Amino acid sequence: MKIDILTLFPEMFAPLEHSIVGKARKKGLLEINYHNFRENAEKSRHVDDEPYGGGQGMLLRAQPIFDAYDAIEKKQPRVILLDPAGRTFDQAYAEELAKEEELIFICGHYEGYDERIKMLVTDEISLGDYVLTGGELAAMTMIDATVRLIPEVIGKEASHTDDSFSSGLLEYPQYTRPYEYRGMVVPEVLMSGHHENIRKWRLYESLKKTYLRRPDLLEDYDFTEEETAFLDQIKESLERENL
């Protein structure tokens, strides 16, 4: 995968030299290029200007971003504009991006963009319902979530298919050694070696966590008969606890 990032602050992306993303780059599975579009600004070096019609703040000008974009060697990239008004980023979208060969991220700053910049864009994406100073942190988050899904980056597919959201549910609780720590013990079912019982326990706990913390994820979830039965048990158990 090849990723190009248009930004005023390329130095902010140093974390992408480390961990999973850094390893993917060293393996040759990922190429990341940074393009400081201030270098594409006209002689004044100004990348922003006041909005026509008045208003607060400054807008990024179209010219530096268009010129930076034009200078990138590309075929048919997915061009992502980081914008609070865009579609909310989620795991399903990360899975979409992981199938692409070329991605371009445009990171904004200041009050917003000249609307004409959006002529370059295929996707307008938001990290969530809040405003960041710039698009760099959002871009890094999306890149990390996407790159780890590329085949061979993590190694074992199960490492990410069991993650929260990959199945549509939050991930079940997990434990490692020691068996007992400060009076807290590992659930016996996980010590049993009985794979089917462990699978059922994990599914039950995933459903329970999702029902309690993110019930919105269950609204469009396609339940199996087993999952429906487990959810009924969870609701009955919680009702008894509240009596």
UniProtKB/Swiss-Prot annotation:
CDD domains: TrmD-like (cd18080). Its EC number is 2.1.1.228. S-adenosyl-L-methionine binds at residues 108, 127-132. One of its GO terms (biological process) is tRNA N1-guanine methylation. It catalyses: guanosine(37) in tRNA + S-adenosyl-L-methionine = N(1)-methylguanosine(37) in tRNA + S-adenosyl-L-homocysteine + H(+). Transmembrane segments: none annotated. Keywords: Cytoplasm, Methyltransferase, S-adenosyl-L-methionine, Transferase, tRNA processing. It is an enzyme of class 2 (transferase). One of its GO terms (molecular function) is tRNA (guanine(37)-N1)-methyltransferase activity. SUPFAM superfamilies: alpha/beta knot. It is found in: Cytoplasm. Coiled coil: none annotated. NCBIfam families: PRK00026.1, trmD. Specifically methylates guanosine-37 in various tRNAs. Homodimer. This is tRNA (guanine-N(1)-)-methyltransferase.
